[in-house]
Amino acid sequence: MLNAATGYDETMYYSSFPPSQLYKWLDLNSERFINPVFRAFQPELETVYEEFNRSQDMQGSLQSDFMLKHIFPGHPYSRAILGLQEHLKKPRLGGLVDFYKSWYVPENMVLILVGNIKLKEAMGLINDRFGRLNPQKALNGKPILK
């Protein structure tokens, strides 16, 4: 199983796999960050656009967007997580790449493994795979409140 979710402060990737496949999972997922492939993202964009359209029919989502827009004016929290309709219709690959390079850095990452995994072995594999990521200076987001 593989899934992802986006919040205001995080992007989460969820996976379920047998412990015997840990090395394969680490290979695949470290490559996602070490050598990302930015190609046409139309298929995923369609999924996000469907989510956006569904959110426009959900009272709670509309209320939350309205509340955050007025509580945090000018802050990224004031914008809907899914973005604006016009941005979804005309996405810019360059903007996606810039965002990725700014925020998807080792200093902003956390890896959590749960299950029947041997810690010492897992740590060696993790350091071997993810240790190839180049350290970056993490950006500081805007303060929520002053």
Mark where each language-model region is:
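Short, intrinsically disordered, charge-balanced linker/junction segments flanking boundaries
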Residues: N140-K146
